[in-house]
């Protein structure tokens, strides 16, 4: 049995005898239920003979008074509050937002709320033809439903950094080829033949005229023709060789037709 309040009469009577009531009354003060018992004068000494003591006040350790710390302004920290429920057809924005000084307002948000908009494009010069104004306008911001943004194809702008990166990757792939691997060499093999340099119509016409006069050229004449046509001696020599082979083939076909 436990009692949270003052000791009840029943609990005291069951534990102690009535012979010690005077002793208990002098030790325990009376509660509101019982009248206050007067303490005997012998227990309290008389201090009227001693003079009263007076102490000099000590200087305060801290000169300034203790004041509560001022609360932080609401500008620094904004506690999260429940936002109003938006409908299914309400427009939404991306997560990388920046605050604007009232540039665009939304009817779904409270009047005192902060307005947000998407960051501007990283290439502002490409939007020079959008409008005459230099400030931000509604075409500069992108709004749309999730379905519209999902269906919209991403636009990639070519940049010199991307081209340089692609070229470096291509070079690394070439360097990774093993020269001892015949399969890789066969796949990436290139012809050692020089790039074909076709003759112009004027050069071909002059060479044909020279071929009609003489099927074989001397070294001096070949040098002169090459200088006039802005060609090398080797190019003139090869052209005459090919032209003689072509003429020989044409004569052989003509002879075969006559015999048949």
Swiss-Prot record:
DNA-binding region (UniProt annotation): 192-251
The UniProt record lists the keyword Phosphoprotein: yes
SMART domains on file: HOX (SM00389)
GO cellular component, one term: nucleus
Main location: nucleus
Modified residues (Phosphoserine): 159
Compartments where found: Nucleus
Keywords annotated in UniProt: Developmental protein, DNA-binding, Homeobox, Nucleus, Phosphoprotein, Transcription, Transcription regulation
Gene3D superfamilies reported for this sequence: Homeodomain-like
GO BP terms: anterior/posterior pattern specification; DNA-templated transcription; embryonic skeletal system morphogenesis; negative regulation of cell cycle; proximal/distal pattern formation; regulation of transcription by RNA polymerase II
Coiled coil stretches, renumbered: none
A single GO molecular function term of this UniProt record: DNA-binding transcription factor activity, RNA polymerase II-specific
Region (Disordered): 120-181
PANTHER family given in the database record: AGAP004664-PA, HOMEOBOX PROTEIN HOX-C9
Subunit comment: Interacts with Geminin/GMNN, which inhibits transcriptional activity.
Function statement: Sequence-specific transcription factor which is part of a developmental regulatory system that provides cells with specific positional identities on the anterior-posterior axis.
Entry's family note: Belongs to the Abd-B homeobox family.
Protein name: Homeobox protein Hox-C9
Record gene name: HOXC9
